C-alpha cells in the first residue's frame, strides 16, 4: 500500500510538472500575449512594450517559467487578466466547493476500496472475488463522464433522489450541500476505488 501511495504521489508530481510545461508552451506559441489581450490589438507599440515590462513579459521564456513556478509555490498565482484580481482570490472563492468535493470523493474511495479489496483477497477465486473484480474492471473501463451522466439520469432525472440543478450552496444548509455533492463525489470516487481495490487485493495476496 505504501508503495502504491508513493507511486501515486510521484505520478502526481510528474503530471503537474509536465502539465505546467505544456500550458506554458501553449501560451508561448499562441498569437499575441497578455499585454495585447489587455490593451487590444490596436495598441501603440510603446504602450505594449511598457506593459510587457511591467508584467515581466520581456524576460526570457525560461526565466518567466521559473518565476511563474516559484510564485505558485509561494502562493502567488499572479493576476487574472480577465477579472483584474489576484488569481488566489478566485481560487479561494471556489475552493469552498472543490475542497469538500475532493475530500468527500476521497472518503468514498477509501470506504469502497478497502473492504472490497480485503474481501476479494480473503475469498480468492471464489464467486465473490470474481464478482468484485468484474465490477472493478467495469469501474476502470467506463469513462468518468459517461458514468457521471448515468448517475444523473438514474438518480436525479428518473428517481428524483438528487437534484440535477447543480450545487445549492452551503447557505442552504450543510446536509443539503452534502446531498448536492453526492453524485459528483460518487462519479469521482468509483473509478479510483476500482483501481485501489484491485491494488489492495494484489498486495494482500502477495504477502
Explain the meaning of each model-derived region:
Residues 58-114:
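An internal, D/E-rich "acidic patch" concept
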Residues 2-4, 13-16, 92-129, 144, ...:
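Alpha-helical transmembrane segments of integral membrane proteins
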